[in-house]
Amino acid sequence: MKINVFETKEELYRAVADFYIKAINEKPNMTLGLATGTTPIPLYQNLIKAYQDKLVSFKDITTFNLDEYIGLPKTHKESYFSFMRNQLFNHVDINLDNTHIPSGVLEPSEAIKEFQTALDAHQIDIQLLGLGSNGHIGFNEPGTSFESTTHKTQLALSTIQDNSRMFDSIDEVPTESITMGIKDIMRASKIVMIATGAQKADAVYKMIQGPVDESLPASILQKHDDVVIFLDKDAASLLK
């Protein structure tokens, strides 16, 4: 693991954006694994600005998103389909036919099969991850098998509580999702993890310095050959 710690979130997100701009310019047709939630938004904002400044192009990029809520139509403002269009895709030159997000409205078994088939046909060059306060990656909650592929998952209460800030009330937060599995995530050539804030410090510590155990899904990253972690000082505060 290569661990980068920054004084401020602004410095962190500039560094992550520079990392992606360099990587995309070196391989313009790469396949990116993307994440949702509040963590990647500043990265996407920096990448949009870089595109507007003609520093990077996404026209030959293929993307796979980690997950989608079950039961939310694409048109729902909090679906990850809508999120990706609003936060990135609508603002850059990406071909939407080359973007892949699990379906939240198909029968879950069909959605899983459709997404896994597309995923298996590609090699993800860089997989972006955020970190749940309970150590989840994607929507792979504690206890998920390290051998898991794309699957339906029940969201942990802590995840529902964390995500409720995006909804009008906690009762509106979906309780199930389809997520890329941990085995799929680990198949990526490179993994980029972003974690900020003191509320993530315990999960960061366990991810990096704790035992590799399915009770802390992100701990599996210790077994990957090429992981780059971007932390602000608050998220890194428990590291020794």
From Swiss-Prot:
GO terms for cellular component: cytoplasm. Pathway: Amino-sugar metabolism; N-acetylneuraminate degradation; D-fructose 6-phosphate from N-acetylneuraminate: step 5/5. It catalyses: alpha-D-glucosamine 6-phosphate + H2O = beta-D-fructose 6-phosphate + NH4(+). GO terms for molecular function: glucosamine-6-phosphate deaminase activity; identical protein binding. Pfam families: Glucosamine_iso. GO terms for biological process: carbohydrate metabolic process; glucosamine catabolic process; N-acetylglucosamine catabolic process; N-acetylneuraminate catabolic process. The active site is at D67, N134, H136, E141. HAMAP family: GlcN6P_deamin. PANTHER family: GLUCOSAMINE-6-PHOSPHATE ISOMERASE. This is Glucosamine-6-phosphate deaminase. It comes from Acholeplasma laidlawii (strain PG-8A).
